[in-house]
Amino acid sequence: MKKAVVLLSGGLDSTTCLALAKSQGFACYALSFSYGQRHSAELCAATRIAKHMGAADHKIVTLDTALFGGSALTDASIEVPEFKESPEIPVTYVPARNTIFLAMALGYAESIGARDIFIGASSVDYSHYPDCRPEFIESFQSLANLATKAGIEGDRFTINAPLQYLSKVQAIQLGTELGVDYGLTVSCYQANEAGEACGQCDSCTFRKRGFKSAGVDDPTRYQKCVHI
């Protein structure tokens, strides 16, 4: 069976990617990161999801939190803002996060003989993060095949971003068709220890709108009653 490394945050998109990779016949090696994120409940969710969905293995890598300063997701002194339409890169951007995560996934993949890496990046219904754009994914794939023994020898890597051009509605519809239990997932940028969502941040807003527009019951547990 072919192997794939799947970046698994515990959120909606990465869980959909895990389900999709499994449906394509991959033995999935889930990889999560503890990097000082305030929404650490997502790591508990990732553990539940990996077990529930039958991942071949699940590793949680602890990174030095000093690598990720200056973000509302890692610095308690910076407030996570409520959702607001804006073309600007928000304060929830974590410096070079996907680059670092993919680099770790690449090393792991080469070491276990996997040549496919899955990431839940999307350039639709997102917060203008530069490391979610298709040109970033394409560039990293080129780098992967220039920087590794396997790549140089022609055993090439593929960086799979299957949600790249899907809206949140489409991602939810796809996951629902694949049998994903979204009640296990945590997407909120500031979920409490119980995994209950704030309902106000960018991630919560995109998620709520997605379920509503998809006509799928929202299984998210919220900290308080909120409205779009």
Curated annotation (Swiss-Prot):
Alphabetical list of InterPro entries matching this protein: QueC (IPR018317), Rossmann-like_a/b/a_fold (IPR014729)
Cofactor: how bound: Binds 1 zinc ion per subunit.
Molecular function via GO: ATP binding; ligase activity, forming carbon-nitrogen bonds; zinc ion binding
Positions of disulphide bridges: none
The UniProt record lists the keyword Cell membrane: no
UniProt superkingdom: Bacteria
GO term, biological process aspect, one: queuosine biosynthetic process
E.C. designation(s): 6.3.4.20
Pfam families: QueC
Keywords linked to the UniProt accession: ATP-binding, Ligase, Metal-binding, Nucleotide-binding, Queuosine biosynthesis, Zinc
Amino-acid positions noted as binding Zn(2+) in the UniProt annotation, renumbered to this chain: 188, 198, 201, 204
Reaction catalysed by this enzyme: 7-carboxy-7-deazaguanine + NH4(+) + ATP = 7-cyano-7-deazaguanine + ADP + phosphate + H2O + H(+)
Binding, ATP: 8-18
Family annotation (PANTHER family): 7-CYANO-7-DEAZAGUANINE SYNTHASE
Protein family per UniProt: Belongs to the QueC family.
NCBIfam families the record matches: 7-cyano-7-deazaguanine synthase QueC (TIGR00364)
Reported function: Catalyzes the ATP-dependent conversion of 7-carboxy-7-deazaguanine (CDG) to 7-cyano-7-deazaguanine (preQ(0)).
Protein known as: 7-cyano-7-deazaguanine synthase
